[in-house]
Amino acid sequence: MFDSATYQRRRQALRNKVQNGIILILGNNEAPANYPDNTYKFRQDSSFLYFFGHSHPGYAGVIDIEAGEDYFFGNDVDMDDIIWMGPQPSVKELAAQVGIQKSFPFSQLKEVVGKAIAQGRKVHFLPPYRFDNMMLLEDLTGIRAAIVKKYASVELIKAVVDLRSVKEACEIAEIDLACNIGYEMHTAAMRLCKPGIKEQYIAGVLDGIAASYGSMTSFATILTQHGETLHNHDHSHILEPGRMMLTDAGAERVTNYCSDHTRTVPVGGKFEGRQKDVYNIVLACHDKALEITRPGITYISVHLEVCKVLVQGLKDLGLMKGNVEEAVAAGAHALFLPHGLGHMMGLDVHDMEDLGQIYVGYDDEIRPSSQFGLASLRMGRRLQEGFVITDEPGCYFIPALIDKWKAEKMHTDFLNFDAIEKFKDFGGIRLEDDILITSEGSRFTGEKRIPITIEEVETIMNE
């Protein structure tokens, strides 16, 4: 947690952005895995963390705009809880830690919300993503759980996005620390990547490194020699010579700030032939994004410039042909890069994705595309100092997609399918770093950059 002044300042800033009514921010509850007392590792709602600070289940906060007051709701523990869990701070104590003087039992939340509704006041809430909170909102507001998400306050969503998008110095420091853990995770994976090792073993080591810092991974670890599957959580394979291992993994600090990095390395520690060729193309794409990323530029334009680097590189390999700009405009490159360049990052690894990418990654100026590949770009809007985003180009050879496009004669003016056929067993490469937008451009987050050049990767893998 940060100091109480941080949370007071954030709630006041939110109050200033919402015209009237009350703002309801629900925390999360424990989620049973297979019976009530055996729960998944608890993860608090990120907006509740941002405005109310506490990573404990079963709480809610209310910001009353006209009254200028904040309320904290939760239940104190009883003796049975103390026997099993030990002494716990009271709700009043938790509220005071984040600068709130008025705390109430959770049962009184319905009275406060009901009174506001009876007075004709607006009750602002964010889109719920957990079913228990959908049901709670039905109980509080009378809106059916099945449709309550449609009634989330757009005014509140936009206000929260405005505040959470620009990271404070204390947040940047936490992200840097999360990236330091990410450095340990990824360099461990590089050292362990050898023929005969099971993917699951390495993935388990990475998860253990994150846990050893009192935190957890920021998402389910992706570690596979089948990098052509973008989010491959199957760790069942034995690493084979001649393949490449893609590791997309991140850590989450005890404060819940995240890291998210991807590296792709050769099994056995030495890039060979076409591995080196494709890797250098992806690295050039990655470096192009770093070169031009700065405040004021739209990230969709950065994405498209990176795609031009990809097309030129694939032309040089004989896999693509024709005019580079026309190929990108047509979307022919999406055969190899069917996702976007990056996304926001912070308290969520895909920051604020629960609020809707239409508000987080886009705005009234920049709207999402419907073109295949470009439609998957999560972040297109104009960049501002203080944003933390990912830079994650890739190049994938997806057999099913290649077969489909070839059969449908897709983009034959730009794609050399005969040459592409020879790469169907290649897999995929992705390289990802977390980037802070600064006043002058951008910088990597974390103390040290994870090895990324061919020389750096081969050196650490063969130490």
Where are these regions (language model features)?
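Active-site neighborhoods and metal-handling regions in enzymes and metal-associated proteins
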Residues: M1-E463
